[in-house]
């Protein structure tokens, strides 16, 4: 269930800061958000898939850490990103 190359490229195009940007916090957070959305859909139909649920929790924790990093280094970029992604503070 990983993101396809096309999906990942689409997310990178949308959130990149410069032409060859693949590793900025914004891009990483956006990719994790897409993975989390996909995994949430999977878990709606496969409630007993505990391994995937654990992976989901790890991804959410990693995204939270990246969001905290972005918030401490650039609050305006943080606020803009959570608004774009529709995340809660």
Swiss-Prot record:
Q: Which GO terms describe its cellular component?
A: cytosolic small ribosomal subunit
Where does the chain cross the membrane?
none
Q: What keywords is this UniProt entry annotated with?
A: Ribonucleoprotein, Ribosomal protein, RNA-binding, rRNA-binding
Question: Which InterPro entries does the protein's record reference?
Answer: Ribosomal_uS15, Ribosomal_uS15_bac-type, uS15_NS1_RNA-bd_sf
Could you tell me which cysteines form disulfide bridges?
none
For this chain, the family text in UniProt reads: Belongs to the universal ribosomal protein uS15 family.
Please name the NCBIfam families in this protein's record.
Answer: S15_bact
Instruction: Describe the protein's quaternary organization and the partners it interacts with.
Output: Part of the 30S ribosomal subunit. Forms a bridge to the 50S subunit in the 70S ribosome, contacting the 23S rRNA.
Function as written in the Swiss-Prot or TrEMBL entry: One of the primary rRNA binding proteins, it binds directly to 16S rRNA where it helps nucleate assembly of the platform of the 30S subunit by binding and bridging several RNA helices of the 16S rRNA. Forms an intersubunit bridge (bridge B4) with the 23S rRNA of the 50S subunit in the ribosome.
Protein known as: Small ribosomal subunit protein uS15
This chain's source organism reads Natranaerobius thermophilus (strain ATCC BAA-1301 / DSM 18059 / JW/NM-WN-LF)
């Amino acid at each position: 269930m990983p993101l396809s190359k096309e999906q990942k490229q689409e997310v990178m195009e949308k959130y990149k800061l410069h032409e060859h940007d693949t590793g900025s916090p914004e891009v990483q957070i956006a990719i994790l958000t897409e993975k989390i959305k996909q995994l949430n859909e999977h878990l709606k139909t496969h409630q007993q898939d505990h391994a995937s649920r654990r992976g989901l929790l790890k991804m959410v924790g990693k995204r939270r850490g990246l969001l905290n990093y972005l918030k401490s280094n650039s609050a305006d970029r943080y606020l803009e990103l959570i608004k774009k992604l529709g995340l809660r503070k």
